[in-house]
Amino acid sequence: IGDISYAVESKAESGGFSVVRELVGHGLGKHLHEAPEVPNFGKKGSGPKMSKGLVICIEPMINLGRKETVQSRDGWTIKTIDGKPSAHFEYAVAVDKGKADVLTTFDFVEEVLNKI
C-alpha cells in the first residue's frame, strides 16, 4: 500500500501541489469502508501487502494550497484551511494475479466535456 501512497504524494508534490492527510482511501468489500487504509502519502515498501482478491479505493485529494483541512458546520463539507481549490477522485482497483484492474471509469466526464 505504501508504494501507492508514495506515488500519489510524490506526483502531487512534484507539480507543486499538496495532499490531504486526514482523509484516506480504503478497502472495499462487504462494507463500503474496510481495511486497509490507503493514505495519499507514505513510504515505498511500507504498509500492508496487497494480495489477489483485495479491492481498494484510492482517493487522491490534491490541493493548490496547504494540506490542512477544516470541516464545515454542515458536518460533511471539507475545505482546505487556506480556502484554495482542491480536487478529489476515487478509483476502485481490484488486485488480481500479478496485476491490478481499475474498476472505476470516468467516461461520462469525457462525454460531457466533448459536448462543450
How should each PLM-predicted stretch be described?
Residues I1-I116:
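Active-site neighborhoods and metal-handling regions in enzymes and metal-associated proteins
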